[in-house]
Amino acid sequence: MDKAFDEIIGNSHTDSSSNHKVTRYRRRDLRNELGPRLGFAPSDAASRSKDRLYREREEPPLPKRIRISKIPLDVSDYTLDDMIKEFGSPIFSKIFDNKEDRTCIYEFEDPEVLEKIVERYNGHELHNAKIEVEIYQPQRKHSRMNAHNRRKQTAQEHGRGRPGSHYRQKPNRVSKKNKGREKNNTPTSVEALDAELDAYMKG
């Protein structure tokens, strides 16, 4: 009978062990390496940053443009158009008005025209003022945003202190009431307790 009872207990234990599933977790580094092999993009911020830089390198640079600055405010748009027309029709043009002067930007299909405009009008006097003409390389919008985010992140890191350091915490201020309570709650000496006990027994 004891043998049969042991067999019953053994069978029930075997059944419960077979029904109980043990979840085995793989190491985190192995799980992270499994994602790219299955076709999933890595979620690491550094990897995403590398992918973004790779895409920016693959994109062709924008065409160079000409910038004419320090133009007097009384110079009309028609005057500026007449100055540029002798070099051909620009495929892009934009004029900005500031408080002190004006700035215009032009883009031409032929990049060799830009050098000619610089030679012709850089330092040219227009309405008693010398204008400045230069060739510049425009940047894409996401490149400017990335540069702005990097500057912002750097400023935040400087505000937090040195790398690896903890945030500076302000010391906890204890009110005067709490200070008084702390003084009153100080442990009584052994002699004072004995004196109180003697007085209680005599009373």
UniProtKB/Swiss-Prot annotation:
The keyword RNA-binding applies. It is found in: Nucleus. The keyword Disulfide bond does not apply. Keywords: Acetylation, DNA-binding, mRNA transport, Nucleus, RNA-binding, Transport. Residues 47-60 have a biased composition (Basic and acidic residues). Residues 64-138 form the RRM domain. Its main location: nucleus. Gene3D superfamilies: 3.30.70.330. It comes from the Eukaryota. Residues 1-60, 137-203 are annotated as: Disordered. The modification N-acetylmethionine is found at residue 1. Residues 11-20 have a biased composition (Polar residues). One of its GO terms (molecular function) is RNA binding. SUPFAM superfamilies: RNA-binding domain, RBD (SSF54928). One of its GO terms (cellular component) is nucleus. InterPro entries: FoP_C (IPR025715), Nucleotide-bd_a/b_plait_sf (IPR012677), RBD_domain_sf (IPR035979), RRM_dom (IPR000504), Yra2_RRM (IPR034396). SMART domains: RRM. Associates with mRNPs. Interacts with YRA1. Belongs to the YRA1 family. Involved in export of poly(A) mRNAs from the nucleus. Recruited to the coding sequences as well as poly-A sites of active genes. This is RNA annealing protein YRA2. It comes from Saccharomyces cerevisiae (strain ATCC 204508 / S288c). The lineage of its organism: Eukaryota, Fungi, Dikarya, Ascomycota, Saccharomycotina. The gene is YRA2.
